[in-house]
Amino acid sequence: MFKKFFIAILAAAAFTLAADPVTVEARLTEIPGKMPSNDLYSYVYVYKYKVLKVVSGKLDAKEILVGVYNPLIARGKVKDKMADKSKGNVGEFKAKAKHTLKIVPLEGNWDGAVEDEYFDDESPRYLAIEVNE
């Protein structure tokens, strides 16, 4: 009984540590395709970023694929259930812009529609829970 309890505690601790956000400074390299309007449905749109610096946490990738919830709405202006995962001060996403991103794995943090033009790229997807200029 104690052994099962101990294993459950270790598993929960590992999951908690793995879910800690990573903060990076990165440049938005491209905006693929056309974003759907927000009046159709809520979605996460995947952008490609070049990592310039890891500010906190651990990340080895030079490029990352980052999903942003309803990117046509300015960060900090999202008022629905995803408001806590849509923080920041970016008003509009533009190619070549430098952002400070707080990211978590997309899987497990978003289960809705994903607009992802990088279907041939098997890199992990992240969700930006905060984006600042």
Task: For each feature predicted by the language model, list its residue ranges.
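Positively charged n-region of N-terminal signal peptides that target proteins for export
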Residues: 1-4
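Hydrophobic h-region of N-terminal signal peptides that target proteins for export
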Residues: 6-18
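A near-ubiquitous, low-amplitude feature marking generic local secondary-structure context
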Residues: 8-9, 32, 39, 79
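Structural detector for short beta-strands of small beta-barrel domains
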Residues: 20-52
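Disulfide-stabilized netrin-like
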Residues: 43-48, 52-133
